[in-house]
A protein has these predicted regions:
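N-terminal basic/disordered segments at the start of proteins
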Residues: 1-13
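A short, acidic, flexible beta-alpha connecting loop/helix-capping segment that sits on the rim
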Residues: 223-229
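Alpha/beta enzyme core
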Residues: 18-82, 87-195, 201-221, 232-235, ...
Length: 244
């Protein structure tokens, strides 16, 4: 078994499904309600139903893996500017080396893949490059598909095409936003697909049930979790929707 195969098996060890809590938002937004103390939040959820966490390099290094028992740890490996920037970036660049990911013993690395912008080809080249670099050290890559035109992030054609393109360029798993015909995303993608959360949604449990019925193998939610009034209850409901 290769390093990639071993890590992919670990990602999907819980019945072939993956439930990630995404706490990487401050890389873009800085201060965020609910993420005032990420290390303590992670530790408080070590016995919850979540399978693991998505963290930026700085927080990743501050959280001892032993403190979160057997949870999966995914390293955020790309950057596209902050909320204070004057333009939306058409390309997200790798900022965490494969050596760093290996040193931290990351189970996978998450990178953003922006499609349809003025630097579309550059974005493709960057994704292919980082996939090659991480694969050299046996580390899987999760590509999160983003539309350069943010209003199209829920467009079926954009999501399905972006997922397939990312897989063709080397991604081992896709993180994709909800779209009406989600089965088109999963049926055309040769690698596992998990659902991206996005803004808080009162009916998000129903959305999870729908995408799982259409082939999604997991979810990676942030604000729906860390800004929930009852985090444990929300996690339990989402886990139930994912696994039943």
């Amino acid at each position: 078994m290769t390093g990639i195969q071993r890590r992919m098996a670990r990602l999907l060890a819980n019945g072939g499904k993956l439930f990630l809590a995404a706490f990487d938002h401050p890389q873009i937004y800085g201060t965020m309600e609910g993420l005032e103390n990420t290390p303590e939040l992670v530790k408080s959820l070590k016995d919850s139903e979540v399978d693991g966490f998505i963290l930026n390099p700085g927080m990743f290094e501050r959280i001892c893996p032993k403190a979160v028992d057997d949870k999966v740890l995914v390293l955020r490996g790309s950057v596209g500017g902050t909320m204070l920037g004057t333009v939306y970036s058409d390309v997200h660049y790798g900022m965490a080396s494969a050596e760093l990911a290996a040193k931290l013993d990351a189970d996978a690395v998450l990178v953003m893949f922006v499609i349809g912008g003025s630097k579309d080809m550059e974005s493709e080249i960057e994704l292919a490059r980082v996939c090659e670099e991480y694969h050299k050290l046996g580390i899987p890559v999760i590509a999160e598909v983003l539309a350069a035109d943010y209003t199209r992030n829920n467009d079926t054609e954009v999501v399905a095409s972006g997922a397939r393109i990312a897989a063709e360029l080397g991604a081992d798993m896709i993180k994709a936003f909800y779209c009406p015909d989600f089965e088109k995303v999963t049926s055309n993608c040769p690698v596992p697909v998990i659902l991206a959360g996005g803004p808080k949604d009162a009916d998000i449990v129903s959305v999870v049930k729908e995408v799982v019925s259409k082939g999604a193998v997991g979810l990676a939610f942030g604000r729906n979790i860390f800004q929930s009034k009852d985090i444990r209850k929300t996690i339990g409901e989402l886990d139930g929707a994912l696994r039943k």
